[in-house]
Amino acid sequence: MRLVFAGTPEPALPSLRRLIESPRHDVVAVLTRPDAAAGRRGKPRPSPVAQLALEHGIPLLRPDRPNSDEFVAELTELAPDCCAVVAYGALLSQRLLAVPRHGWINLHFSLLPAWRGAAPVQAAIAAGDTVTGATTFQIEPALDSGPVYGVVTETVRDTDTAGDLLERLSDSGAELLERTIDGIADGSLTAVPQPSEGITVAPKITVESARVRWDLPAHVVDRRIRAVTPNPGAWTMIGELRVKVGPVTVDQAAEADGPLAPGEIRVGRNSVHVGTGSHPVRLGQIQPPGKKLMNAADWARGARLEEPVSAS
């Protein structure tokens, strides 16, 4: 089939690679978001998907307004049989959805109808899900609500960050997307409506939602930090200093040195503990402003923290 691939960030790359390498399909163009400012100098940089397309000599489509009359006409001229989508980053109008005869097939990183929305991987980890997955479905105007072609499941590990889990789902999801496109091409796949029960929503992660709430139970603090690692990164205030924090370890044994109130920090010879709504957690890494991630105990010694000090 003639395919247009729509995607932007790094997790879309395994899917694009598989479709480029497939002998059954021809990726005639790649749709991605316009170049965005990156780095300290803010110089515009092509998206990861754009860079891969350029390496393979595939025409790039980077409209500022993908639902404009001009772009609808441009896509119509390409006459794609199907459009495959992985994290493109924009809502699509009904006119655009109607262009390819087999529609737009999206790879979503959850087991729909669970975790519809922008941050399904983060939501699954924060909620303590033990199993998640990826779903291919037909895009329709309502958010992530279209009929399902296929799913693949993935175990959520106790130490998974969003980055870890997304990397695995990107690989297994790419294989699922290729199988789905193959099945649509040969007529062996039929989409099944999503159930009306079990719908949950995963809204976009905001800077404020990534702030650590030390008043929550330790296991919840742990999950919520891992859910926003590496991006945008969990953060907290220590005095007047805003720092990012990496994944933590729940450490009930630290209570032997006395209780810690939520947010209260205890600096040991080789450790930094913070109180939560239940048990203390041990900080692994801290990233001060303008610096790289570093060992939390090393940072605390260098910062010469004087107790009592708290995170908030």
From Swiss-Prot:
Record key words, sorted: Protein biosynthesis, Transferase
Cystine residue pairs: none
GO MF, one annotated term: methionyl-tRNA formyltransferase activity
Gene3D superfamilies (alphabetical): 3.40.50.12230
Domain of life from the UniProt record: Bacteria
EC number, UniProt record: 2.1.2.9
One Pfam family this sequence matches: Formyl_trans_N
Matches recorded under HAMAP family: Formyl_trans
General function of this protein: Attaches a formyl group to the free amino group of methionyl-tRNA(fMet). The formyl group appears to play a dual role in the initiator identity of N-formylmethionyl-tRNA by promoting its recognition by IF2 and preventing the misappropriation of this tRNA by the elongation apparatus.
Family: Belongs to the Fmt family.
The name this protein goes by in its record: Methionyl-tRNA formyltransferase
Record organism: Mycolicibacterium smegmatis (strain ATCC 700084 / mc(2)155)
